[in-house]
Amino acid sequence: MEKFIESVANFIDEEDVKVLKAIGSDPIVLHSIKKIFDYPEKANKYLILLRDSPVAVYLVAKISERLSRYLEGEDEAKCFAVFLTALRELRECGDRRVLQNMFLLLKEAIERRLSDGKYEDAAKLVMEFQDFGFKSYVKKVLFFALEVSEEGDYRRAMRILELLPETDAVIDAKASVLLEWGRSLAMSNPEAGMKKIEESLRLKDTVEARLAMAEIHESMGNYEKAYFIYTSLRSLYPGIDRRIARMLMEWGEEIGDVEKLREAYNLAMGDRLLAEEIERRIKKLEAQRLSGS
């Protein structure tokens, strides 16, 4: 067991090593701690033997957290799982000093993961232990999730946000990311983009999302649906009349409907160049009708 203590001494503080040696006077405790790190997938089973020693459980959490800094992939994931399992065992601990140490360890773990870009793991810790004084960290994780979305990794941003509690800010952030994702997708796949916009609207009905939906409908040639949405926004979105006018101009010319062009002209009265272009198309369409009659 001396070798085991020496091997983990590099990952914990000097005071922790002294405590580990002290509780090591009970061979069951020390053997159980060693077994947890030999067989991390069986941590639950061996932690049962440590329930009478919150300090031992805390040391398991600390060793696994510190050790995980030097691991990657599956080994790191196993260490993180041990860390979480040990912390859960300490939830109902009545030892105030252990709980204080647990808080400091959690704070260290969350901040390290945020610094290392491991936002999903940070979000899991914040979500599970927010009642231990980590509610303020929801905003920090939220910030990094939005930064990820700015880089265009919308899927990962949503994955991080899904791990956070359903606060108003988180719901708003999800709606915003889905809106950006939908707009991005719509450039190459309008149907897929539309689905993301619809998801955004289900979370929060915003003018921006409805406008994006109208724009996608317009790009797909679904002028009637786009027109319905655009007109519903007339009292909410300044300058919408110009958008409607341009769409009506294309729609009217495409189907040969002079009335739609005239409606477009009336809406474009504040834009001289657009009004002149619509007027030109009206005259062209009327001339075509006359020549064909």
From Swiss-Prot:
<feature type="coiled-coil region">
    <location>
        <begin position="259"/>
        <end position="291"/>
    </location>
</feature>
<keyword id="KW-0175">Coiled coil</keyword>
<feature type="coiled-coil region">
    <location>
        <begin position="195"/>
        <end position="215"/>
    </location>
</feature>
<dbReference type="InterPro" id="IPR011990">
    <property type="entry name" value="TPR-like_helical_dom_sf"/>
</dbReference>
<protein>
    <recommendedName>
        <fullName>Uncharacterized protein AF_0844</fullName>
    </recommendedName>
</protein>
